[in-house]
């Protein structure tokens, strides 16, 4: 394994540590809930859902985290302002975990942010997902008004697929403002950099970009290979356990190259994802007997899964 030469930023998001050298802290796992097509949601516009089923998913996540040592963040998705607001309120009441405020629509994210107000509890736990190349000044203003300090920075564009091009999105090029500078204008102080994943094969380019981000800037880096995995029709057609084994390889590869967090998709897949990630984390941490990097927590997979 290796050590990054840049000083690594380690953020504490309501008790969840993310960042650092390979093996220093466990990988943070981010599972999705209330996504489009999620069976526990009966009305995605009004935010009507099965609360018992949602609570069971949250409880399972907490149990797996306690078993493996991998901390978790909840990816809360919503199709409308009303729905996303209701989902966040449920999360606030039923877990102490940090969460991503997530929607494919920036208007939905901003609307929900305005509904939630400047609650100190929300400010500690809410991670804006995400600030990306098409951000608007209204969006940045809403983030600043809400007093948020943490955001996912999506350094991805179909015009910037190679790793170095994604770095240009982060730091800016010529007269184009970089995403980090834009995020700072919105009051963001903690940056979770996600270079984006186009498909399974190019997860290697994403991983290279994460490595460069950590080497040059020291920001926590990670990605969301889940969409690419679930769109992999040829492998999905083979069914379980073949799909899960292949998925585990896709999710763990970035970690071997320094990634700090993984968005793994639907929370129902947590049982196999946690075990795969924890095993990888343990091996990396053991190798640090050679690199000299000390574990930053006693709640580490190396100390829990064997």
UniProtKB/Swiss-Prot annotation:
Family to which this protein belongs: Belongs to the MtrH family.
MF GO annotations: methyltransferase activity
Assigned EC number: 2.1.1.378
Gene Ontology terms: biological process: methylation; one-carbon metabolic process
UniProt catalytic activity: methyl-Co(III)-[glycine betaine-specific corrinoid protein] + (6S)-5,6,7,8-tetrahydrofolate = Co(I)-[glycine betaine-specific corrinoid protein] + (6S)-5-methyl-5,6,7,8-tetrahydrofolate + H(+)
Superkingdom classification of source: Bacteria
InterPro entries tied to this protein: Dihydropteroate_synth-like_sf, MeTrfase_MtrH/MtxH
Protein name: [methyl-Co(III) glycine betaine-specific corrinoid protein]--tetrahydrofolate methyltransferase
SUPFAM superfamilies per record: Dihydropteroate synthetase-like
Summary of the function given for this chain in its UniProt record: Methyltransferase able to catalyze the transfer of a methyl group from methylcobalamin (methylCbl) to tetrahydrofolate (THF) in vitro, to generate methyl-THF and cob(I)alamin. In vivo, the methyl group probably comes from the adjacently encoded methylated corrinoid protein DSY3155. The methyl group may then be ultimately converted to carbon dioxide, and its oxidation would also provide reducing equivalents for anaerobic respiration. Thus, may function in the pathway that allows anaerobic methylotrophic growth of D.hafniense using glycine betaine.
